[in-house]
């Protein structure tokens, strides 16, 4: 599923949005409208296994795994660049989307004029932290593991300190689903490459 926010008379640029895990691109409507006001056309897709792209088990990337999701992000960026010649293309990527963006930049950084990574980290560090917090028979599973150390009003307090935003996430039927067993290992499979200095050297120097 794709989304377009193009209520812009004289565009100054194009923004591609890559959303996070267990959510969907429609949640970025408020951001997209603000970017429209600033002169940017905004495009987004629901990743494999997410939002309106769910065709089976929610969160399932399919047999091709996380690498296919990364390829989707890169291909969508290329299509947007071709559809908007002469306009600078920017990538805004959140959480899981930011991990995909990190991979995309290893091979396709030239197509972007700037990148914003939100709610991001180094995959290797995140994997270690999740493993450390998931020890013992009473350890939380899935997204609940992120809420360790936070209050337990909904179980999703780790998302935001804004209770209204947390409540909106909890109420959204396309958000917060349990992750398939294969999803997390697939996500962290790219950690080694993303931490490799020789791979990082391929990113365009000076990319904002």
Identify the residue ranges that each predicted region occupies.
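Alpha/beta-hydrolase active-site loop
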Residues: 62-82
